[in-house]
């Protein structure tokens, strides 16, 4: 099964999206947006930037866990991954975002 985006509204009326893999696991979480239209633009940005290796910023947290940020051409963070125990599992996460990030399916939960 292919991946999809889920768009939601927080209790303080901000918007965020997540990218889900075909197995339902969240593989990328966006920042908060003040409008639904801005969140939808963020989804479009994931679609255009996720296939490009150079858009992934690989990081190590202070606790030694690995994660990545997906960035737009202007270097703004579009979304961040979960924390991974190993650098290899982070690479698997990046591959999953590349494979699912061009999905046209959006489940609107707002």
UniProtKB/Swiss-Prot annotation:
Sequence repeats: 10-58, 61-109
Matching SUPFAM superfamilies: YegP-like
Statement: the UniProt record of this protein carries the keyword Acyltransferase: no
Keywords: Repeat
Protein family per UniProt: Belongs to the UPF0339 family. Duplicated subfamily.
Protein name: UPF0339 protein YegP
């Amino acid at each position: 099964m292919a991946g999809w985006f889920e768009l939601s509204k927080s209790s303080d009326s901000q918007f965020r999206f997540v990218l889900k893999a075909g197995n339902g696991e969240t593989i990328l979480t966006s920042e908060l947006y003040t409008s639904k239209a801005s969140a939808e633009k963020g989804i479009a940005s994931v679609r255009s930037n996720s296939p490009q290796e150079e858009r992934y910023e690989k990081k190590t947290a202070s606790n030694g866990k690995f994660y990545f940020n997906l960035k737009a051409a202007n270097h703004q963070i579009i979304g961040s991954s979960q924390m991974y125990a190993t650098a290899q599992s982070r690479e698997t996460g990046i591959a999953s975002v590349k494979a699912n990030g061009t999905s046209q399916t959006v489940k609107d939960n707002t």
